Amino acid sequence: VAGARQAVGEARRIVVKVGSSSLTTASGGLDADRVDALVDVLAKSRSGGEKEIVLVSSGAIAAGLAPLGLRRRPKDLARQQAAASVGQGLLVARYTASFARYAVRVGQVLLTSDDMSRRAHHRNASRTLDKLLAMGAFPIVNENDTVATDEIRFGDNDRLAALVAHLVHADLLVLLSDVDGVYDGDPSTPGTSRIAEVRGPDDLAHVEIGSAGKAGVGTGGMVTKVEAARIAAAAGIPVVLTSAVHAADALSGGDTGTYFRPTGKRSADRLLWLQHASTPQGSLTLDDGAVRAVVERRTSLLPAGIASVEGEFSAGDPVELRDARGRAVARGLVNFDAKEIPQLIGRSTRDLARELGAEYEREVVHRDDLVILHP
């Protein structure tokens, strides 16, 4: 653990995510003192010029509650978006004033999961963040709550933070919350202890992780944080999950929170968003042979292996690949429009090319555009 923590302290490019409960008062409004305390840590951590930090910050909806006369976070999307519209400006204004104490400029970046799943948007977001860092500005990222629909919302900023960490090729992801790590039981119960290190999913197989956030102003609990940590770790990025009051220790490599070891290698950007940020526009049901070929042998999906098609999608859209029981086994970018596929079902590419033309002698989903969901 000591060696891993040393590597954490030496990380150069870091994504830090802070949740609503770490930025708000007991009544749910934005707490200027807590914002200042976080900014103190972040500004000092990057003051030597050796670290670049991107902040993924919740709090827009929470910041908009009091000005709109709302006592608690609304459940309906329209009022959440109204609160975010008012609160996002207040949130960034608070950060701008706080960072100004260190003569640091703030840059606002608002994203939706749609931005992460469209290649051009994804590429532009990456360039913007890189340029902000190169120019010495401090990027503050949030979900664009005012335009996100139910279908394309992240639902929490934890998953967004994991994807941003991958997007900017971060050396470390730090998830700050109101709990100082993952525990082997309910943290409020005597006798439970903090889990210092998670080497892989099996380490948490017998741990019951609660689902609700403490303060009632955010959407994420420990479940979403652990899931985000797993996404980042699977993409080769180490993660520290701890409380906001221990942020300085986390950034310096101190023994705080729960450390998630990287479990995989860095994958292509688009495959990570394909698995975790894309919204499938339809599905293809495969026969048993095609499921084995795609999942076990990692081959491309050919027309011969398709049993049925559902949904309305265009070539290039993400679709789910399902087995005969309806279980999603993979996700991929389809090479045909939905209306073209019925005439291809169960047929060989050679026959299709002979009958319909050479452009039909291709895979329905190429193996380079596939991610396996259930091996």
Language-model segments: which ranges?
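C-terminal catalytic "cap/lid" subdomain
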Residues: 1-105, 109-375
